[in-house]
Amino acid sequence: MQGLWTRRQTLAGLGLALTLSWSAAQAADVTVKDSRGEVSLPLQPKTVVVYDLGALDIIQSLGGAVHGVPNQALPPLLAAYKDQTKYPHIGSLFEPDYEKLKALKPDLIIAGNRTLPKIAELSKFAPVLDVTVGDGDQLTQIYRNIRAISTIYGVPQKGEAEIKTIESEIAAVKAKAQQQGSGLMLMTNGGKMSVYGPGSRFDMLYTVFGVQPVKDKIEVSKHGQAVSFEYLLKTNPDWLLVLDRDAAIGREGASARKLLDNKLVHATKAWRNQHIIYLNAANWYLLSNAGPGALRENLKQLSDAFGR
């Protein structure tokens, strides 16, 4: 009888130890880097909500779980998150729904550029990973986010594998791009046009992907430098890389293709040589190249165009 009681005590002790061990594992934190520096956040959190499309792209690439997404027109790359029965809306990128957050009780909130002003308020509901990508070395910041998210989800090796693949594809595109002459990033928006050069929000096109900028110095501005059709003929780049903002946000309006179909543009080298690339607007504008899926799709489009 004494032996049976002892065995029961031992088993009970083991059960308690396992329970405590599991609780400790669930409560464990991990140190990662985000836009603020080093932060301590939950390891393998049970409930994660996301206010950044680039972060959604990263999580999808890693095979991680998400429990709340912004009420936002999602690009084809993120179509899986349109099912509200699986991924309830938690407000917009600019205006989080705090009542929904209160009900979901997330263990981690991931937020970025468009939600930056709300991060202090969001942090009242759960720890926040800030994946904002600012000016400067954008690719390094994107790699930082991939490493942080993959570490939090407990799959750092997957994050490193994604980075290695991206590095290889960038090198291949850069080698092609440097043989193509000059290129100019052009955004169309409501019938108006603006261009972006090195140092702008689309700096990666030049400094990472290897497209050679035109000689004309372009004003660095959030909304780009407003230009005319005459400007396009004057600078006359070998390639025009066109981003249709109306298409990116799903707004009705004259398409970029229609806007550029005129005599002045017809006289440019880019038109004559069929060197106009209509970029994946959602990947460039909504996701800002900030996730592995968007990056790889954009690299493939450039590689295919430069390889013609």
Model-identified regions with their sequence ranges:
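Proline-aspartate-enriched helix->loop->beta-strand connector
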Residues: 102-111, 127, 232, 236-241
